[in-house]
Design a protein with these regions (language model features):
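Contiguous, glycine/small-aliphatic-enriched amphipathic segments in soluble metabolic enzymes
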Residues: 1-119, 123, 127-135, 143-145, ...
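A short mid-domain helix/strand-loop element embedded in enzyme catalytic domains
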Residues: 139
């Protein structure tokens, strides 16, 4: 079985974060399902290895090109000095079928401008034909998405497509949290398109009563603070961003928390699972069944057996 090549961008990582990355990737369970390619830690890898207590030899392979990556090894690539250069290089490698996934490991100081810049950077490099990119935040089993009143309906449509592809949900259910009651009609009209969207709900009641549990995703319409409240409510120690609507799977670890091995492993497994879901979806919908009737034929013809057939 071909192993997926996972590009990890770690240019902004400090020494302790690099140590965590190497320790997590050295796990045999990770190396059996993917081939990690890490950029940004080539200058500190020797000192990091000296600090790690090694019971067995860590399989490190230093490379200068993605195509030289070896399965069963932690491939440290020495080619890019900044985060933006690494992302461009990884995206270019994806276009050449040499990288399957990208995971961005930002610095400890991270904000929405960084996330917007990441999406813009990828859009500049990719010719995107998979729809509008949406930046999700995932914590545990809860998916959240920030939106505005102007783009709410379009974002719900894009989110519906994204969860069908990436989460194999046939009819994903969406809850909209917001104060604009006039959007109720627009949300209800989506159900005529067989999109299961409901709301808008009042934020305090929705979160306090845990009304989010039956839904597959929650969209916060101009309710940034309420979104943060919900994420804090369901926090299980691993919160990360995931960008849908791109031809490749891109995840971004939340830089506001200290990186742990379990967090990195969860994001890697999530990315691989999402990639496999996309492959299954495209395989199932690539060649739809053709109609089994002749458009110009008549289905109201009646055979009269009392008449003789003229030759």
């Amino acid at each position: 079985m071909k192993l997926l090549k996972v590009g990890l961008v770690a240019n902004a990582a400090n020494g302790s974060t690099c140590e965590t990355i190497i320790s997590a990737l050295a796990n045999q369970d990770i190396l059996e399902v993917c081939t990690p390619i890490v950029s940004g830690i080539q200058d500190s890898i020797d000192s990091v290895l000296a600090n790690i207590e090694q019971e067995v030899q860590i399989p490190i392979c230093k490379i200068s090109r993605v195509e030289d990556a070896l399965d069963g090894k932690i491939n440290i690539i020495d080619c890019c000095n900044t985060e933006s250069e690494s992302i461009r290089y990884m995206v270019s490698s994806f276009l050449n079928n040499m990288v399957d996934l990208i995971i961005d490991l930002p610095s400890e100081i991270c904000n929405s401008k960084d996330e917007t810049a990441l999406i813009s950077l990828i859009n500049e490099t990719l010719s995107n034909e998979d729809g509008k990119p949406l930046n999700w935040t995932i914590s545990g089993n809860v998916r959240t998405l920030l939106t505005t009143g102007d783009t709410l309906v379009d974002d719900i449509r894009e989110a519906h497509i994204a969860l069908r592809k990436d989460a194999t949900l046939i009819k994903p259910r969406f809850a909209v949290v917001g104060k604009d009651d006039t959007s109720h009609g627009n949300i209800a009209s989506l159900r005529e398109e067989k999109i299961m969207a409901f709301g808008p709900f009042e934020a305090d009641t929705f979160i306090n009563a845990k009304h989010y549990l039956p839904y597959d995703a929650v969209l916060f319409c101009d309710e940034d603070s309420a979104c943060q409240r919900l994420l804090a409510e369901v926090d299980e120690g691993c919160s990360f961003e995931y960008i849908s609507g791109l031809p490749l799977v891109v995840t971004r670890l939340n830089g506001k928390a200290d990186l742990t091995q379990s967090m990195l492993k969860e994001v890697i497994y999530f990315s691989i699972h999402t990639h496999r879901n996309r492959v299954r979806y495209h395989g199932a919908t690539k060649h739809p069944l053709e109609r089994q009737w002749i458009p110009r034929g008549r289905d109201d013809f009646k055979l009269d057996l009392t008449k003789e057939v003229s030759e």
